[in-house]
């Protein structure tokens, strides 16, 4: 058991009989004296894939579940199934396209480093991406000279179909770093 203020992104909890994976946490500190800090957590239900949102006070107790994390590499596509290979013992992990539809927007053809498969008692639960990914812009409007002084943005499409807002000075062919959870531009990639 852990208090709500000890829960971190990527942990798994058992709440109301559901196995939930923590996707995001917003901390809300009320201005009234004596009011408890609230933790608004966004989960994904591991078994159904549905998104769940709950609020907790800092001292609410939640049952945490230990998950096994295995580093994986994208291997190949078989029909509507995506196969990832364990980096250490070469065990294949298969996901249906619907299970990882959101994650696929961040995985270009060659794959990305830092992916992990979450398992519990031998059952594959989810695919976890790193916090940031580097991707190449394949389509955007031409860059505007001198636009680095303004904060205006424009849409840019990646090879996977993902569209993010980028500063006007960027052009097609440039590599950028994207925050996965927030789907936002962070900067140019190294």
Curated annotation (Swiss-Prot):
CDD domains: S1_EF-P_repeat_1, S1_EF-P_repeat_2. GO terms for cellular component: cytoplasm. GO terms for molecular function: translation elongation factor activity. It comes from the Bacteria. Pfam families: EFP, EFP_N, Elong-fact-P_C. InterPro entries: Elong-fact-P_C, NA-bd_OB-fold, Rib_uL2_dom2, Transl_elong_fac_P/YeiP, Transl_elong_KOW-like, Transl_elong_p-like_YeiP, Transl_elong_P/YeiP_cen, Transl_elong_P/YeiP_CS. GO terms for biological process: peptide biosynthetic process. Belongs to the elongation factor P family. This is Elongation factor P-like protein. It comes from Edwardsiella ictaluri (strain 93-146).
């Amino acid at each position: 058991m852990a208090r709500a203020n000890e829960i971190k992104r990527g942990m798994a909890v058992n709440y109301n009989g559901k196995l939930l994976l923590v996707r995001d946490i917003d901390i809300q500190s009320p201005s009234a004296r004596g009011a408890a800090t609230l933790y608004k957590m966004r989960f994904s239900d591991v078994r159904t894939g549905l998104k769940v949102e709950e609020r907790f006070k800092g001292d609410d107790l939640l049952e945490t579940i230990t998950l096994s994390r295995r580093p994986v590499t994208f291997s190949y596509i078989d029909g509507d199934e995506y196969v990832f290979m364990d980096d250490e013992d070469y065990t294949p992990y298969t996901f249906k396209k619907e299970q990882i539809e959101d994650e696929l927007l961040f995985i270009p053809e060659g794959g990305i480093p830092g992916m992990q498969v979450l398992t519990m008692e031998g059952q594959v639960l989810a695919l976890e991406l790193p916090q940031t990914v580097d991707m190449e812009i394949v389509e955007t409007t031409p860059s505007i000279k001198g636009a680095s002084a303004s904060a205006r943005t424009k849409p840019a499409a990646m090879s996977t179909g993902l569209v993010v807002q980028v500063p006007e000075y960027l052009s097609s062919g440039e590599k950028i770093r994207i925050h996965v959870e927030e789907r936002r531009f962070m900067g140019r990639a190294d």
